[in-house]
């Protein structure tokens, strides 16, 4: 896991085995307010692009593929396996509000080692901000990502770490009771700006964290779900996406992963020295040492032929 890898080695759907992908996160990954959320669109899009993928997760549909009919009347099957947990924070938190932790669940289920994903799509942190657990939020996320990386079985696995969407604070104003005086001492509009500021700060820190981890040679990639969700039109209840929002997420994720899988890995061209080119005894320099070399040598000794000068 700690190796330097600037290329994209997991590649590809042309491989003999499908690419195993785990959607990991909170209720937005689980698909709250929408049948399996963005995951059904992601799977459908990826297969339409020609990729052979296997969705994996601690929540296993045991080989049964559900079906869904989209707004255009198109019915498709998808792989529903995932690791999305409604109400979860990055790690277990208790104080003003108790939240179960994704970190502890990853560890207790041993899901990464057991499911062996090639790619993890991680989006988590909305409930931390909702419950006013903003202090230390990026440290908790980095710890979670490192635990995932440590549990990954192959050196060419990768974790995509995503930003989180904005919340429509005014729609779910009462849900932010954990903010206490910060909430009561400000107008609703000003409080909404404060919460949006926490989201902005967290998302900026995610991008910076991914960049720093990449410089350390860790296989992480940045994803920006925040960029595709409009809180004024794409949310069902102020927190969770509606079907339009989930579809946008599925499109974003599938385009991002398709680009990753379809990009040719970087190759290193090594300089070849004369010592690499010619083997001792390979008189005719054909890369092999056999009777042909003996014939050339005999001709040389009989002055009926020659050999290449020394290199």
Q: What are the functions of these language-model segments?
A:
Residues 28-139:
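Conserved SGNH/GDSL esterase-like catalytic core that processes O-acyl groups on lipids
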Residues 25, 243, 284-288:
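Residues in Ca2+-coordinating acidic/glycine-rich loops
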Residues 274-311:
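Alpha-helical segments with a strong preference for the paired helices of cellulosomal dockerin domains
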Residues 21-24, 234-266:
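Histidine-centered active-site loop/cap adjacent to the catalytic His
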Residues 24-28, 56-61, 122-127, 162-167, ...:
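Active-site-proximal beta-strand/loop segments in catalytic clefts of secreted hydrolases
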Residues 4-19, 267-274:
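Low-complexity, acidic Ser/Thr/Pro-rich repeat tracts that form intrinsically disordered stalk/linker regions
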Residues 16-20, 49-54, 115-121, 153-160, ...:
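Loop/turn elements at helix/coil->beta-strand transitions in domains of secreted/extracellular proteins
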Residues 168-223, 243-248:
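Substrate-gating cap/lid alpha-helix
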């Amino acid at each position: 896991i700690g190796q330097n890898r600037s290329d994209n080695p997991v590649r590809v759907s042309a491989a003999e085995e499908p690419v195993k992908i785990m959607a990991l996160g909170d209720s937005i990954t689980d698909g709250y307010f929408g049948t399996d959320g963005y995951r059904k669109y992601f799977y459908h899009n990826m297969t339409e692009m020609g990729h052979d993928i296997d969705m994996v997760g601690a929540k296993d549909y045991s080989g049964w593929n559900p079906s869904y009919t989209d707004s255009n009347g198109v019915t498709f099957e998808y792989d529903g396996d995932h690791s999305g947990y409604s109400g979860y924070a990055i790690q277990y938190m208790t104080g003003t509000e108790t939240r179960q932790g994704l970190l502890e669940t990853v560890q207790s289920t041993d899901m990464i080692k057991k499911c062996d994903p090639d790619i993890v799509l991680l989006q988590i942190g909305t409930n931390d901000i909702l419950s006013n657990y903003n202090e230390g939020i990026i440290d908790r996320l980095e710890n979670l990502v490192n635990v995932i990386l440590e549990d990954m079985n192959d050196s060419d696995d990768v974790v995509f770490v995503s930003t989180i969407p904005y919340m429509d604070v005014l729609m779910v104003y009462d849900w932010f009771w954990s903010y206490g005086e910060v909430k009561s001492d400000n107008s609703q509009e000003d409080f909404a700006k404060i919460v949006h500021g926490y989201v902005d700060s967290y998302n900026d820190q995610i991008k910076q964290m991914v960049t720093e981890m990449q410089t350390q040679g860790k296989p992480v990639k940045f994803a920006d779900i925040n960029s595709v969700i409009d809180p004024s039109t794409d949310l069902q209840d102020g927190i969770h996406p509606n079907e339009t929002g989930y579809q946008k997420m599925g499109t974003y994720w599938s385009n991002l992963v398709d680009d990753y899988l379809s990009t040719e890995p970087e190759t290193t061209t090594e300089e070849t020295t004369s010592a690499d080119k010619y083997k001792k005894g390979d008189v005719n320099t054909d890369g092999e040492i056999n009777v042909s070399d003996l014939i050339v040598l005999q001709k040389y000794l009989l002055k009926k032929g020659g050999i290449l000068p020394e290199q």
